[in-house]
Amino acid sequence: MGSQWGKDKVYRRAMNEGFRSRAAYKLQEIQERFSIIREDDNIVDLGAAPGSWLQVERTLTKGKVLGVDLNPIPSIDGVMTVVGDLTTSEVQQQVKDLVGVVNVVLCDASPKLSGHKCYDQARAIGLGEDALMFAARTMKQGGNMAMKSFQGEMFHELLEEVKKHFYVVKTFHTKSTRRGSTEIYIVAKNFIGSSGDVEGHIQ
């Protein structure tokens, strides 16, 4: 653990409270502000490892909670997990089989950063596009979504794409985000319903 993490008060608080990362507080802030999770909702969390959002989700709903990630997610009581690529039809079908009706799709994932701003931005937008595609193919009409993104040249295009699929779309900066970060969340409510088509790749 680097000195930056060791000195991070929010990180230390998360560890003391039993969360796997500081990201748990970001979901708590989103829920407090937008009430995207209802007490009986079934939730699918994309890019869920190490599982801090799953820990919070389990406390917010009596419904099913499932995390999807390329890497194994350490077990959490009452939470199902799938190891695989969220863009594949096999994983999407597995999610449907396990969860049934999907009311909420969440994605706090971000790509491994290379240090090259344009490249990292493109990969982050691509991940957001994949999450939106997943939601469009699996979510029940009227469902809600929240996903992490990063401000930059292509962010507005992703935001406009999300607006095609949800009646209400907002952006949100959490207090738990590190100072100076371009991280931003897209919060989308009341899924319109679609055939699952998301237009192309954002250029």
UniProtKB/Swiss-Prot annotation:
Keyword rRNA processing: yes
Keywords: Cytoplasm, Methyltransferase, rRNA processing, S-adenosyl-L-methionine, Transferase
Sequence positions that bind S-adenosyl-L-methionine: G51, W53, D69, D85, D108
GO molecular function: rRNA (uridine-2'-O-)-methyltransferase activity
Reactions it catalyzes: uridine(2552) in 23S rRNA + S-adenosyl-L-methionine = 2'-O-methyluridine(2552) in 23S rRNA + S-adenosyl-L-homocysteine + H(+)
Location of the protein in the cell: Cytoplasm
Active site: K148
GO cellular component: cytoplasm
UniProt EC number: 2.1.1.166
One Pfam family, short name: FtsJ
InterPro entries assigned to the protein according to its UniProt record, in alphabetical order: RNA_methyltr_RlmE, RNA_MeTrfase_FtsJ_dom, rRNA-MeTfrase_E, SAM-dependent_MTases_sf
Source organism superkingdom: Archaea
Homology family: Belongs to the class I-like SAM-binding methyltransferase superfamily. RNA methyltransferase RlmE family.
Described purpose of this protein according to its UniProt entry: Specifically methylates the uridine in position 2552 of 23S rRNA at the 2'-O position of the ribose in the fully assembled 50S ribosomal subunit.
This protein's name: Ribosomal RNA large subunit methyltransferase E
Organism lineage: Archaea, Methanobacteriati, Methanobacteriota, Stenosarchaea group, Methanomicrobia
